[in-house]
Amino acid sequence: RVTSMEKKGYLLLADGQLYEGVLRGAEKASSGEAVFLTSVVGYMDTLTDPAYAGQIVVQTFPQIGNYGVVPEADLAVKPSLAGYVCRELCDKPSNFRCGGTLEDYLTQQGIPCLTGVDTRAITRRLRDKGVMNAAILTEKPADIAAAAAELAAMTIDAETETGVEDIVPAEKPGKYNVVMWDMGAKADTVQQLEKRGCAVTLVPANVTAEAVAALSPDGVAISH
């Protein structure tokens, strides 16, 4: 039940199913491909994983945000998912590394979060019908069928840019000069290369092979 102090929000699936809940995080509408995640831990990994770029992620675990925001757990500099859906968002996290609440983080990153919905029912629907386009809305559509049809016809850009915009020189020196085309590189991938003696230079996805060759790399990598 949405109280007078809370703002209503909605999740509309492309098949016309509408879920009403509480809008937290960034108070804005957003659309993307709806997917579900059944993991019990590691929500910071999920939020910052470039693999979820442009998607609305539904978490089945009932309470998210128990240990707050832990910057060390980030897989990328900033999250790139379109929206977040969970049953309950923890307001009082407890962790010695906690750097703030998850809601504050979502607000700062411009990510809308819908809570107070039956995420397992949503998951069953996505499991049975397959992933589909969806939207987190700030207002209930006047014509749900028309809004769903428009959503179903929408083309979600699978090439969402999640990497660096300019060439980023290696932060740490190394024996080997590795140049990585950044199409959404995970921080851990770079760190693992650095541990193995590599100085990792990141370049945007649209940088030409000639430009990469001009950096005289010992090796070249392409992020997933």
Regions found by a protein language model. Name each.
Residues 4-177, 181-215:
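RNA-binding accessory domains that recognize and position tRNA/RNA substrates
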Residues 221-224:
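Glycine-rich beta-strand-to-loop/alpha-helix junction loops that act as flexible
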